[in-house]
């Protein structure tokens, strides 16, 4: 597959300021304002608690806060657009006003993404890669904001896992570009834990370099996921070390953004990996 040379500056065009992933791995801290997320459901569902947790994550090294109002865990309850908006919009407005940090909205609904960006979010993080809601790519294009296109599919009906994943992701890219999304605003996510078996997830982790080889920035979202729990035989809240191992491998294989719950530990690991890999061409310290 031909490599794209998208944006030599290696910048994600966020607000209030753009973020460079050339010299450091960007850490995206997860803020779930849901009652039923697999890892932290119900913990941050009040405005004050959500704001406090966002501030803690920024202090711990997060560059982006990813806010989600509907759990994406398998079997989670679907919520209406109105309910999702009522959860995320006040949090986005408050964090934008008080913390001034780039915010990502974790949604696959175009109407929610639209309102979230108007409220201050500057990245759309879509677990369906602009394939679930036909208006999603247009919303990203209209607002000229980055969009994370995650790999996903309704069934695990692969002929050949990795080539099929690349093909699926490039379909998402095509949808986005045809809707008017600037290629510099496209971020890819291999979708660890979505429509993949335990062995699929390990195989994808082992070949992450093929995704960074497409020429777009890559977001890796492995935090506390089930395949880590299966390897370590540990519950979600005890998977920070396992998550750290996946993040270190991901950074070595060219991932640019890591989406995590355990920001303090992972931000330190990312900084150490960046130094050892001489990311940005300047030795740290």
UniProtKB/Swiss-Prot annotation:
InterPro entries documented for this protein = DHP_synth-like, DHP_synth_dom, Dihydropteroate_synth-like_sf, Pterin-binding_dom
Q: Where does (7,8-dihydropterin-6-yl)methyl diphosphate bind?
A: 72, 106, 125, 189, 225, 259-261
Q: Which positions in this protein are listed as binding Mg(2+)?
A: 32
Enzymatic reactions: (7,8-dihydropterin-6-yl)methyl diphosphate + 4-aminobenzoate = 7,8-dihydropteroate + diphosphate
Q: Which Pfam families is this protein grouped with?
A: Pterin_bind (PF00809)
- Highest taxon of the lineage: Bacteria
CC cofactor:
Mg(2+)
One Gene Ontology MF term: metal ion binding
Q: What does this protein do?
A: Catalyzes the condensation of para-aminobenzoate (pABA) with 6-hydroxymethyl-7,8-dihydropterin diphosphate (DHPt-PP) to form 7,8-dihydropteroate (H2Pte), the immediate precursor of folate derivatives.
Per its record, how is this protein called by name? Dihydropteroate synthase
* Gene designation per UniProt: sul
């Amino acid at each position: 597959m031909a490599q794209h040379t998208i944006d030599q500056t290696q910048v994600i065009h966020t607000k209030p300021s753009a973020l460079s992933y050339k010299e450091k791995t960007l850490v995206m801290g997860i803020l779930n304002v849901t009652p039923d997320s697999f890892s932290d459901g119900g913990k941050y569902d009040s405005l004050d608690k959500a704001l406090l947790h966002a501030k803690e994550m920024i202090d711990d090294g997060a560059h982006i806060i990813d806010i989600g109002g509907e759990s994406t865990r398998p079997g989670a309850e679907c919520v209406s657009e109105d309910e999702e908006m009522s959860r995320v919009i006040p949090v986005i407005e408050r964090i934008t006003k008080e913390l001034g940090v780039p915010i990502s909205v974790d949604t696959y609904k175009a109407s929610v993404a639209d309102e979230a960006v108007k409220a201050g979010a500057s990245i759309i993080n879509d677990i369906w890669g602009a394939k679930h809601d036909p208006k999603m790519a247009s919303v990203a294009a209209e607002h000229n904001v980055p969009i994370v296109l995650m790999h996903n599919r309704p069934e695990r009906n692969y002929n050949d896992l990795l080539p099929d994943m690349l093909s699926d992701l490039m379909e998402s890219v095509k949808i986005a570009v045809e809707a008017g999304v600037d290629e510099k605003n496209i971020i890819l996510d291999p979708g660890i834990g979505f429509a993949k078996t335990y062995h699929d997830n390990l195989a994808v982790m082992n070949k992450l370099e093929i995704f960074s080889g497409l020429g777009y920035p890559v977001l890796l979202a492995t935090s506390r996921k089930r395949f880590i729990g299966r390897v370590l035989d540990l519950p979600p809240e005890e998977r920070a070390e396992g998550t750290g191992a996946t993040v270190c491998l991901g950074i070595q294989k060219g991932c640019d953004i890591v989406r995590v719950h355990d920001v303090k530990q992972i931000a330190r690991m990312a900084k150490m990996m960046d130094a050892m890999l001489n990311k940005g061409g300047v030795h740290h310290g």
